[in-house]
Amino acid sequence: VESAYNEREKTKSGSYVNEYVNNFLEKEPIPGIEVEYTLVNKLAPNIPVEAVNQVMQQLITDNNQVVLLAGPEKEGAKYPTKEEIAALLKQMKSFDLKPYEDKVSNEPLISEDIKGGKIVSEKAGEIYGTTKLVLSNGVTVYVKPTDFKADQIVMKGVSFGGTSVFPNEEIINISQLNGVALVGGIGNFSKVDLGKALAGKRANVGAGIGNTTETVSGSCAPKDFETMMQLTYLTFTSPRKDNEAFESYKNRLKAELQNADANPMTAFSDTITSVLYGHHPRAIRMKENMVD
C-alpha cells in the first residue's frame, strides 16, 4: 500500500480497470489510494495477533477443508487412499502440537566495519543524460535519473566472461551455479531468515551467470538504498554454506530431471539439440545421474 501511495501519480491504467471491475462485480468501494493508505496506517497497528488467530480459528472448521494430492501417474507409484487421508486428518486432532515460534534476529546484515571506497572521477556521460562515475575498485557506474517511478531505484551490473571462460568438462557444474550459489542465504542469514530480516523493507538483489556475462541486479525504495547495497556486498563476498539446503536443492533437481526423462518430448528435444550442435558438451542437457 505504501508503494502504491508513493507511486500514485504513476498509477497504471490496468490498476484503475481492476478497481472498476471489482466495484461493479463485488461492490468493492473505490475510496482512492490516499484514503486506503490513511486507513491502513490507522487500523493495522491496532489489530493484535490474538484477534487474527481468533478469526483464523473461526474460518478453519472440520467441514470446510480440502486436501489435494498430486503426483506422477506411473507404474510403481503408491498414494494413500481417500479413507487413509481422512483417517490421518482425524488423527491429527490428537497430536500435541505446539504453536510455531518465529525467531527473528535483530542482527544487522553486515556486522563488521567495512572500509568504503571512493569516487575517483565523475563526469557527464556521452549519451542518455547519464553521469559517469569511476570507483576506486575499478567499477564504472552510470547514473541515470528518470521520472518513470517516484519510489524506485533500479540497479544492474554486467561484466564479461560468463560460462564461456570455463572448460567444457566443468560446464555441467557451472550450469547449476545460478541455482546453487545463494541457496543457503548470505552472510549469517539463511534464505528464510533473510526474508524475515528484510520484513518492512523493499530491497532485493540477484546475481547470475550467462554464456558470456556475469550480472548483478536489484531494486529498492529510496529509503532502502543502503540495504540494497549491503545485499549486493554480501552477494559478492559472503554466500552462506548450508549443507541441508544444498541437499534439498539436489533432491528437488533430481526429481525434476527424473520427471523430465519420463516425458517423450524430452528425448525428441535432446535428439534435435544433439544434431544441431554436433553433440557438443556445452549443449548437453543435465541428467539425473549427473547430479551427484
Language model features: what each stretch is:
Residues 1-46, 64-72, 142-144, 149-182, ...:
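M16 family metallopeptidases and their MPP-like homologs
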Residues 18, 22-160, 164-167:
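Proteolytic maturation boundary segments
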